[in-house]
Amino acid sequence: MLTPPYHQAPQICQTLLGSERHAMTLRRVALCEAEHLAASGPHQTLPPREHDRFYLEVDGHMCPTREPKHGPEDQGYGEAKAGLTFSGHDVAEVSKERHEILHKVLQAQITESETFGPIFDEVYHHAGGDRAAEVIVLADEAGWIWGMVEDLLLYAVQILDFSYIKQYLWEADKLIYGEGSAFVAPWVKGQETLLLEDKVEQVLTRLERFLDLAPALTTILHYFFQQNASRMRYGTYCQRGYFIGSGAIESAGKQLSAARLKGPGMRWNSAELNLPLTLHCVFLEQSWQTYWDSQALLAA
């Protein structure tokens, strides 16, 4: 399906419909349908299966807003929090490096972390997570995510996205050896190998040895590695066949925010922004036709 850039909408309306004025009509219709979608909750469901392994991926992406700023540190952005759920049975291996999720449930909204909890819980139950044999949550290091998970899904397996580990190892090593040092890549590779062998404590010990040399390591060591050590048992996760990266929600988040909400001059208030986010979620989870079929049944 062709998805044209946002700024080309008036020209496309002029070409196909004979007038750019139809763009505003289409906008009103789209936002009206988005209100119906938001009010009716998730539309996509996952096929029920026995002994299912259920994944939840959570992330946040910053979007420019028109909201009043609350101080000099406020850059005029709101966080679009997104939750993606899928079954391990619905992941197809396209290539060695790429997988495709065949069925998924996706919800996103600009809101505070406290009010995203009920949305997260609704997605989990609607998708059938409470029937699964195992529930795995994949996310980055954001504290609001893990606090929400511990409140709502106490027995879920919590996994810190391995790609973030790599990023922080690179940052740590640059502090130790300096930018461009030939020691950086081999050192990072060695720590990755240890983590994939469940030797988290050994990595922490190695980082602690360099604190006197690079005091700035304290922040990375404490706020990332020490606080998330229990979510870094990658050897165990791989043995059990778990995914250890949250690339699906990263990709969805970029499509939700970057393509339609971060263009030149695009600034929204949160209420307006949440409506197109709802439409984008339905489009990306491929439940668009399901929604319209349900509307046709209601109209019959």
Predicted regions and their residues:
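Catalytic center-proximal scaffold of phosphoryl-transfer enzymes
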Residues: 1-300
